[in-house]
From Swiss-Prot:
SUPFAM superfamilies: UDP-Glycosyltransferase/glycogen phosphorylase. It comes from Geobacter sulfurreducens (strain ATCC 51573 / DSM 12127 / PCA). Coiled coil: none annotated. CDD domains: GT5_Glycogen_synthase_DULL1-like (cd03791). Pathway: Glycan biosynthesis; glycogen biosynthesis. Synthesizes alpha-1,4-glucan chains using ADP-glucose. Belongs to the glycosyltransferase 1 family. Bacterial/plant glycogen synthase subfamily. Gene3D superfamilies: Glycogen Phosphorylase B. ADP-alpha-D-glucose binds at residue 15. GO terms for molecular function: alpha-1,4-glucan glucosyltransferase (ADP-glucose donor) activity; alpha-1,4-glucan glucosyltransferase (UDP-glucose donor) activity. Keywords: Glycogen biosynthesis, Glycosyltransferase, Transferase. This is Glycogen synthase 2.
């Protein structure tokens, strides 16, 4: 099949979170299955600064939005044997950040990503690439299924092209003031409750949910959750209406990149059969971060965006307990300014057993996955989560809240001693999280039992193979609906 993957970020060209990892690894997995998969994204300043062989493709597009014409140019690179196209427009994409500064989103985001989506459709024609499926990711690409269903339904070029729209996080819907519809190039007649209007605002994700041939999200539990008032973020009714066309597929990870037996970014390699190297990784991590080098002290790691969704409020509440405990805790993260300020304030107190690392530090993340004994994910909600999959791959036992993709991927040791791969808690409270940590510590003291838990996690298939197979099935379903 011919598949175009459209995303606002793709690793390693640009990334702010797990979306970029998915849109890099899934195309590669599908390519290995024999499909002609290509990827397209904006050409951000950070992509221009990479040494990934981005070159000009000598194709251009012109997009008119609200009376102004914007020109785009196509660039091309590759991830392995997957072609990657990048849409260039310096006004829109040559900026320090992808979506906004720490103070807030860029006010012209509707126009920026409308330009991107409309350019994508033009460039397909310039390249004469007619995909069977266009797979769109999150609100930044939502305009593509909307255009193909409501504006270009009679365009013969796309007559046999189906759309699949993936919701990676329903909390980010592409909500804008009503006048922003003019910035997208869509007719104002679509600003109705039937299509794009949402409590007086423009909602791009709502439009994509209503117009895509099929919709996916990134775990089966999250699929069920988002059709309820608790987790539906106001779109539960729209999602329930499309419930038969909504599928949950758990993400995988790139098991070549995330492989403790071969990872050159960590201090010492190891495997499920030969775990000795992990102890060396722990000691080196402790030394690098200026913590006491203590092999027997349990070390909890956390690599996270600093956002309300990720349970950072619970972490802040737990920090005094952690500081007074016999544990060590390492946090790496960047994000919300108020969390940065509060974590900086705690860091200034100088607790010897706590290392708080704020800002983007790519080299440190794999060292934390490898050197930690436990990995904390106290998420308020979690559509899928990749960190728990990476942690298990590295023999680091996850302690997670029992929600979304965490529920689908981490088996609680307390409930299932012979199958368990981690420790879970239900209530979103610091006490519930601490109780799960204490259960994990009790397990940690039984070294032989702990090694069995580690190995179960390391043996779990967290690759993209199964997920890619499910996407392949959905692509065929979507394409069949277009062929009638």
């Amino acid at each position: 099949m011919k598949v175009l993957m459209v995303a606002s970020e793709v690793a390693p060209f640009a990334r702010t979170g797990g979306l970029a990892e998915v849109t890099a690894a899934l195309p590669a997995a599908l390519r290995r299955m024999g499909h002609d998969v290509r990827v397209i994204m904006p050409f951000y300043r950070c992509a221009a600064q990479t040494e990934l062989g981005v070159r000009k493709a000598r194709k251009s597009a012109e997009v008119s939005l609200n009376g102004e014409t914007h020109k785009g140019f196509l660039r091309q690179a590759a991830l392995g044997d997957v072609p990657v196209y990048l849409v260039e427009n310096r006004e829109f994409f040559s900026r320090d950040y992808l979506y906004g500064t720490p103070e807030g989103d860029y006010p012209d985001n509707p126009r920026r990503f409308a330009f991107f989506c409309r350019s994508v459709l033009q460039f397909l024609k310039r390249m004469d690439f007619r995909p069977d499926v266009i797979h769109c990711h999150d609100w930044q690409t939502a305009l593509i299924p909307i255009i193909l269903r409501l504006e270009a339904a009679d365009d013969p070029f796309f007559a046999r092209t189906a759309t699949v729209f993936t919701i990676h996080n329903l909390a980010y819907q592409g909500l804008f003031p009503a006048p922003a519809i003019a910035e997208t190039g869509l007719p104002s007649a679509l600003f109705t409750t039937e299509w794009l209007e949402y409590y007086g605002q423009l909602n791009l994700m709502k439009g994509a949910i209503l117009t895509a041939d099929l919709i996916t999200t990134v775990s089966e539990t999250y699929r069920r959750e988002i059709m309820t008032p608790t987790q539906g973020c106001g779109l539960e009714g729209v999602l329930a209406r499309r419930g038969d066309d909504l599928f949950g597929i758990v993400n995988g990870i790139d098991t070549d990149e995330w492989n403790p037996a071969a990872d050159k970014r960590i201090f010492r390699n190891y495997s499920a059969r030969a775990l000795a190297g992990k102890a060396a990784d722990k000691l080196e991590l402790q030394r690098e971060l200026g913590m006491p080098a203590a092999p027997s002290v349990p070390l909890i790691g956390m690599v996270s965006r600093l956002a309300e969704q990720k349970g950072i409020d619970l972490v802040l509440e737990l920090l005094p307990r952690l500081a007074e405990s016999e544990l060590q805790f390492v946090l790496l993260g960047t994000g919300n300014a108020c969390y940065l300020e509060r974590l900086n304030s705690f860091r200034s107190k100088g607790a010897a057993n706590i290392s708080i690392n704020l800002g983007f530090n790519d080299p440190l993340a794999p060292k934390i996955y490898a050197g930690s004994d436990l990995f904390l994910m106290p998420s308020r909600f979690e559509p899928c989560g990749l960190s728990q999959l990476i942690a298990m791959r590295y023999g680091t036992v996850p302690v997670v809240r029992h929600t979304g993709g965490l529920r689908d991927t981490v088996v609680d040791v307390t409930r299932h001693p012979r199958e368990g791969t981690g420790f879970t808690f239900e209530d979103f409270t610091a006490d519930a999280c601490w109780e799960a940590i204490e259960r994990a510590l009790a397990g940690y003291r039984d070294r032989e039992s702990w090694r069995r838990i580690m190995r179960r996690g390391m043996h779990r298939d967290v690759s993209w193979h199964n997920a890619a197979g499910r996407y392949e099935t959905l692509y065929r379903m979507a394409a069949d609906t277009r062929r009638g």
